[in-house]
From Swiss-Prot:
Any one GO BP annotation for this protein: cell adhesion involved in single-species biofilm formation
Function: Part of the lpfABCC'DE fimbrial operon. LP fimbriae may participate in the interaction with eukaryotic cells by assisting in microcolony formation.
Claim: Signal is one of the keywords in the record: yes
Family annotation (Pfam families): Fimbrial
Gene name, Swiss-Prot/TrEMBL: lpfA
Protein's name in the database: Probable major fimbrial subunit LpfA
Gene Ontology terms: cellular component: pilus
Family per similarity comment: Belongs to the fimbrial protein family.
Source lineage: Bacteria, Pseudomonadati, Pseudomonadota, Gammaproteobacteria, Enterobacterales
Organism: Escherichia coli O157:H7
Gene3D superfamilies for the chain: Fimbrial-type adhesion domain (2.60.40.1090)
Signal sequence range: 1-24
């Protein structure tokens, strides 16, 4: 009988230890996506700078009384990290995209229904000089470690009469070194 009792106790103990996993409920699953790039350049583009959104906000139509009038500037930056200045000394940034029909060195706002007309978007470097779209560039001397390129963006009137609407746009940037 003692042998039988030991077998029963062992069986009940084994059942108790494994029953938690039998009755465990799944709490869900998901996906982990890894992205990145291996580069051979003097600096690495900061993750914070790779995909940005600059909110120009709502601007009163009355700000644009004449061609060339600008909305308040909104800052943004492109941050470079792990910079090695032994081979290259300067970073250049250029912007490419759809140019405004009336002033091609400005970015065209979307032409979708409900879009504003008579304005483009200008990007200006740290010295408040327009970085012409599709050809201009901003340059900065590299610093060992981190280098930051500072910019501002604003709406610029391209026509004497501006119509209200959305002022959305997208532009790509390219880094080069010398």
């Amino acid at each position: 009988m003692e042998f039988f009792m030991k077998k029963v106790v062992f069986a009940l103990t084994a059942l108790a230890l494994t029953s938690g996993t039998v009755f465990a409920a799944e709490s869900g699953d998901g996906t982990v996506k890894f992205t990145g790039e291996i580069v051979d350049s003097p600096c690495v583009l900061s993750v914070d700078s790779q995909n940005q959104e600059v909110v120009l906000g709502q601007v009163q139509k009355s700000v644009f009384a004449a061609v060339g009038d600008k909305s308040p500037a909104k800052p943004f930056e492109i941050k470079l990290e792990d910079c090695d200045t032994t081979t290259m000394k300067k970073a250049n940034v250029s912007f490419s995209g759809v140019g405004d029909a009336d002033k091609s060195d400005l970015i065209s706002v979307s032409t979708e229904a409900g879009a504003a007309k008579g304005v483009g978007i200008g990007i200006y470097d740290n010295s408040n000089t327009l970085v012409a779209l599709n050809g201009g560039k901003a340059s900065v001397d590299l610093s060992k470690g981190q280098t930051v390129l500072y910019f501002t963006a604003n709406y610029v009137s391209t026509l004497a009469t501006v119509t209200t609407g959305y002022g959305n746009a997208q532009v790509d940037f390219n880094l080069s070194y010398e």
